[in-house]
Swiss-Prot record:
Catalytic activity, as annotated: Na(+)(in) + 2 H(+)(out) = Na(+)(out) + 2 H(+)(in)
Protein name as catalogued: Na(+)/H(+) antiporter NhaA
Main location: membrane
Manganese is among the record's keywords: no
Role according to the record: Na(+)/H(+) antiporter that extrudes sodium in exchange for external protons.
Any one of the GO CC terms: plasma membrane
Gene3D superfamilies assigned to the protein according to its UniProt record, in alphabetical order: Na+/H+ antiporter like domain
Family matches, as InterPro entries: Na/H_antiporter_dom_sf, NhaA
Molecular function terms from GO: sodium:proton antiporter activity
Keyword Chaperone: no
Keyword annotations from UniProtKB, A to Z: Antiport, Cell inner membrane, Cell membrane, Ion transport, Membrane, Sodium, Sodium transport, Transmembrane, Transmembrane helix, Transport
């Protein structure tokens, strides 16, 4: 006779609540990296085939939305880069808030190394780019080689498997999140040409309304969505890139649940008699109890965790691939590869990123304000730092801001080539420096 052993679930510890979102995040980013590669290949093939004109014309299809006297008339490409990407930036805001509240950036001593590494990984590439483009028209692209694409980095680490120490994954993820913060500041400060104070004031009022709704305990999402859309419109008209409203709202999202698990268990204990056969047999009563339990179950999850779990797959598998299809299509020509802008972007990503990360990491460790995490040594850290040169999503996004809506083909070529070299170099060096797998 088969013996089936039933085990009671162990109580959830605080560390589990912090690590489960992190593990889920890594899994989604690893698989979405493969989807991004596929979409990039499709975009490149389309842009270099006989369908190139149709491919470009499709993304420039005009869309018109009219609400009363307000008329929005933009291309599909603009809607993706300014509209859909606002959701992507909202999820970035949620990720940053999570790391600041519970993750690797919540402890300043632990966060010092990734923060310093990220700062070095932004300053050195931008400096190299500026030194190569000083006095030339391409100088405004200085922000392109500063960012790191988390999805591709995690995908590369996933290919290397269990040999990669957990501490390297955490360091690179934390570094990439700080990179995102830097890229957001670059977009807000470096690529805002003019400001309309009236619309900026309206955007601030809308953000204040979101804070007010949160303070008075509004838990339904539709009011926040409506006010968020109004804030997006106001910021769009103010001259600041509208996607930044996503980051602001993400950072404002509460990171703590309304109902702690202990109180939820007490509630279930109090309601235990409701589940007795006599009471449970009444249909209306049953539906009411189930609805109440469902509502309270939702209250045990913070709005931040709920929104991140809900939206992260959509950004990873829909928004970012669509963005790649709309932006990665570039005509592959020898002239693009030899252009000074493309070369500056490649040097910034392939040389500037690892050099800046290694230099600033060495500096803070030398000063004694940080130390290498367990499982890491200098060869592994320096090898992994090459993966941070995979710019892609944010780099292409900044390219569009620096050189117009469609971006500059030479800059896009530099992003694609530099990211590919960084991925190959990083994975190759890690294969060489990581401990060899033990044979069973």
């Amino acid at each position: 006779m088969n013996h089936i052993e039933t085990r009671l679930p162990l109580p959830i510890q605080p560390i589990d609540r912090w690590l489960r979102p992190f593990a889920r995040f890594l899994h989604i980013e690893a698989t979405s990296g493969l989807v991004l590669i596929l979409c990039t290949v499709v975009a490149l093939v389309a842009a270099n085939s006989s369908w190139a004109d149709s491919y470009l014309a499709f993304w420039h299809t005009d869309l018109t939305i009219a609400v009363g006297d307000i008329v929005f008339h933009h291309s599909l490409h603009h809607v993706i880069n300014d509209g859909l990407m606002a959701v992507f930036f909202f999820v970035i805001g949620l990720e940053v808030k999570r790391e600041l509240a519970h993750g690797s950036l919540s402890d300043l001593k632990q966060a010092t190394l990734p923060i310093a590494a990220a700062i070095g990984g932004m300053i050195v590439p931008a400096t190299l780019y500026l030194s190569m483009q000083y006095g030339q028209p391409g100088v405004q692209g200085w922000g392109i080689p500063m960012a790191t694409d988390i999805a591709f980095v995690v995908g590369c680490l996933a290919i290397l498997g269990s040999r990669v120490p957990h501490s390297l994954r955490v360091l690179l993820l934390s570094l990439a999140i700080v990179d995102d913060i830097g890229a957001i500041l670059v977009i807000a400060i470096g690529y805002t040409e003019s400001l309309d104070g009236r619309y900026l004031f309206l955007a601030a009022v809308a953000v204040g309304a979101v804070h007010f709704l949160s303070r008075i305990g509004v838990r339904r999402f539709p009011p926040y969505v409506i006010v968020g859309v109004l804030a997006w419109i106001a910021l769009h008209e103010s001259g600041i890139h509208a996607t930044l409203i996503g980051v602001i709202l993400g950072l404002m999202t509460p990171a703590t649940p309304t109902l702690v698990p202990e109180r939820f268990r007490e509630y279930l204990h109090e309601k235990e008699h409701e589940f007795q056969p006599k009471e449970w047999s009444r249909r209306l009563h049953r539906a009411e109890v189930v609805r109440e339990v469902q509502q309270l179950t939702r209250e045990t999850v913070s709005p931040l965790e709920y929104l991140e779990v809900t939206l992260h797959p959509w950004t990873a598998y829909v928004i970012m691939p669509v963005f790649a299809l709309a932006n990665a299509g570039v005509l592959i020509e020898p002239a693009n590869l030899s252009d000074s802008v493309a070369i500056a972007v490649v040097i910034g990503l392939v040389v500037g990123k690892p050099l800046g990360i290694a230099l600033f990491s060495w500096l803070v460790i030398r000063l004694g304000v940080a130390r290498l995490p367990s499982g890491l040594n200098w060869p592994i850290l320096m090898s992994g730092s090459f993966l941070a040169g995979i710019g892609f999503t944010m780099a292409l996004f900044i390219d569009g801001l620096a050189f117009g809506a469609d971006g500059l083909d030479t800059a896009k070529t530099g992003v694609l080539v530099g990211s590919a070299i960084s991925a190959i170099a990083g994975m190759g060096l890690l294969l060489w420096t990581l401990p060899k797998p033990t044979r069973q």
